[in-house]
Amino acid sequence: MAALRALCGFRGVAAQVLRPGAGVRLPIQPSRGVRQWQPDVEWAQQFGGAVMYPSKETAHWKPPPWNDVDPPKDTIVKNMTLNFGPQHPAAHGVLRLVMELSGEMVRKCDPHIGLLHRGTEKLIEYKTYLQALPYFDRLDYVSMMCNEQAYSLAVEKLLNIRPPPRAQWIRVLFGEITRLLNHIMAVTTHALDLGAMTPFFWLFEEREKMFEFYERVSGARMHAAYIRPGGVHQDLPLGLMDDIYQFSKNFSLRLDELEELLTNNRIWRNRTIDIGVVTAEEALNYGFSGVMLRGSGIQWDLRKTQPYDVYDQVEFDVPVGSRGDCYDRYLCRVEEMRQSLRIIAQCLNKMPPGEIKVDDAKVSPPKRAEMKTSMESLIHHFKLYTEGYQVPPGATYTAIEAPKGEFGVYLVSDGSSRPYRCKIKAPGFAHLAGLDKMSKGHMLADVVAIIGTQDIVFGEVDR
């Protein structure tokens, strides 16, 4: 205490100290020999002065509630972000969607691609023109021979050659079989995603029969590598055309059964009519092709407008939709399968005899029988399969009407035996870009129907 008095500068009885936290000087009073502070008159006078009254600004303030519970604040409601896929069974491969949902209503749909990217276009630059062919089987792995057909036509255009008539008819025949394969997969898996399981089992049995045709003609069920620059790999085996005829005759009955199940089904119509509507103008602006374009009412089919091989010698109709919704696209695919049966029947009736490869030893390999008797044939065979053939310098863009749309190949040659650049135009890439536009404003369950009607395969989208 003496130190405290010395600090304050007083030696009297009542030294003044500062009360902690008050900023007011307090007297120290002696009591029973112990010095402690007690309030006195002088200390109380320090608090005299004006009294603060509530101003007009604070007069409208409300007192706190009697139970000391704050009233609920206005909460900010945000849309839910949902990751759809890539392991979702309706994602048709490795599709990942980042969707913004308001309840069950889709406000935004952002596709994320690249999960199946394999660098196909770069790998092709390190292969000969023949070795690059199997890569195309693995792009759209549901319509294999159509991819081969586009690449073979591009190489033939650079080489300035034309395959024999029989080879062209075989190409058209298997191109339409491939279209049936693709549309069966598209329609039945679309129905399976929406809850209709029966068409999937019925039509996949027919699909197995067409895989047998693939196997009998090339040795492989899927990745055939059958259509090659200059023609096709080998001729049709005996009895195959008869079996294709029997199959096509029975397949129309399967299509009738499919339509009995789906076309007038109330649930199917409710899930597809006015879902994913695309107008003709929007379809053109997004770069749609194939069924996605024809379903919106635009009659555009490269087999009619820019015929290749012998499509100018066959008769068929191009079905178009009127509303541009999922139901119209379903009807277009079913009718395209019927038109493919018409084309298959014409191919079987008009199939000419003759060679199946171009008669140029520098491009197409010789027959096995000739290699046993001719040294030149053996040399040509060895050079073709080791070094490949040189393609004159140039560039070409060749497109065909694949089952999913316009499948294009932009091929650049520098005069060597390997492509300098091969750019692949996949139809599903543009269709996936329109998914946000098509699904906005629909329910979450309708996104599955829209993905199914787009018929997307990620081998060609990611490449």
UniProtKB/Swiss-Prot annotation:
Top-level taxonomic group: Eukaryota
Disulfide bonds: none
Organism field: Pan troglodytes (Chimpanzee)
Transit peptide boundaries: 1-33
Reaction(s) catalysed by this chain's protein: a ubiquinone + NADH + 5 H(+)(in) = a ubiquinol + NAD(+) + 4 H(+)(out)
Single annotated GO MF: quinone binding
Pfam families (UniProt xref): Complex1_49kDa
Keywords, alphabetical: 4Fe-4S, Acetylation, Electron transport, Iron, Iron-sulfur, Membrane, Metal-binding, Methylation, Mitochondrion, Mitochondrion inner membrane, NAD, Oxidoreductase, Respiratory chain, Transit peptide, Translocase, Transport, Ubiquinone
Residues with PTM N6-acetyllysine: 62
Functional summary from the UniProt entry: Core subunit of the mitochondrial membrane respiratory chain NADH dehydrogenase (Complex I) which catalyzes electron transfer from NADH through the respiratory chain, using ubiquinone as an electron acceptor. Essential for the catalytic activity and assembly of complex I. Redox-sensitive, critical component of the oxygen-sensing pathway in the pulmonary vasculature which plays a key role in acute pulmonary oxygen-sensing and hypoxic pulmonary vasoconstriction. Plays an important role in carotid body sensing of hypoxia.
tRNA processing listed as a keyword: no
Leading EC class: translocase
GO cellular component: mitochondrial inner membrane; mitochondrion; respiratory chain complex I
Places the protein is found: Mitochondrion inner membrane
Segments traversing the membrane: none
Names of the cofactor(s): [4Fe-4S] cluster
NCBIfam families: NuoD, PRK06075.1
Post-translational modification: Dimethylation at Arg-118 by NDUFAF7 takes place after NDUFS2 assembles into the complex I, leading to stabilize the early intermediate complex.
Family as reported in the entry's similarity comment: Belongs to the complex I 49 kDa subunit family.
Keyword DNA damage: no
One annotated GO biological process: cellular response to oxygen levels
EC number assigned by the record: 7.1.1.2
SUPFAM superfamilies found in the cross-reference section: HydB/Nqo4-like
Stored PANTHER family: NADH DEHYDROGENASE [UBIQUINONE] IRON-SULFUR PROTEIN 2, MITOCHONDRIAL, NADH-UBIQUINONE OXIDOREDUCTASE 49 KDA SUBUNIT
Name the UniProt record assigns to this protein: NADH dehydrogenase [ubiquinone] iron-sulfur protein 2, mitochondrial
